[in-house]
């Protein structure tokens, strides 16, 4: 298992949780972004910078992800693509996307896009709370505990 992070919009607190988890478990962690990302010196943590542009980081993650990998993203279309490829997807608030829930999330996203396009103010996401950070850390730990042994 490898962990891939859609790092352009990933909150710093979530990156810190991921850095600690990668160091503790030895699971490879790669942050993909269209700008430089600082990562701690580690044999299991690295960053990949892609060209600027719409969804370039997403496309790079889809190109590299393998079945069984974990992708951290709040981007619902990216989550749908990696699930289709056999990977797992987890958002920064600790919600694990599944084949059963991703279609509903895509439909809601499309509906909200339609509302915004028609001029309706749909508001934005709430700031990441301590509860969100804890939910993320807990779900990440569950996923890492269930990964196949590396021996």
Curated annotation (Swiss-Prot):
It comes from the Bacteria. It holds the Pfam family DUF188. PANTHER family: UPF0178 PROTEIN YAII (PTHR35146:SF1). Belongs to the UPF0178 family. This is UPF0178 protein Hhal_1913.
């Amino acid at each position: 298992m490898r962990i891939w992070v859609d790092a352009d919009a990933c909150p710093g607190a979530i990156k810190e949780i991921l850095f600690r988890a990668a160091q503790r478990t030895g699971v490879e962690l790669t942050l993909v972004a269209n700008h430089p990302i600082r990562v701690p010196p580690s044999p299991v943590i690295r960053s990949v910078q892609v060209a600027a542009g719409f969804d370039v980081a997403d496309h790079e993650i889809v190109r590299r992800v393998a079945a069984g990998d974990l992708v951290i993203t709040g981007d619902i279309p990216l989550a749908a693509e990696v699930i289709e490829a056999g990977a797992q997807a987890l958002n920064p608030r600790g919600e694990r996307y599944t084949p059963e829930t991703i279609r509903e999330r895509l439909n809601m996203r499309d509906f909200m896009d339609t509302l915004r396009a028609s001029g309706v103010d749909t508001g934005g996401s709430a700031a990441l709370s301590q509860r969100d950070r804890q939910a993320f850390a807990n779900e990440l730990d569950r996923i890492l505990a269930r990964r196949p042994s590396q021996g």
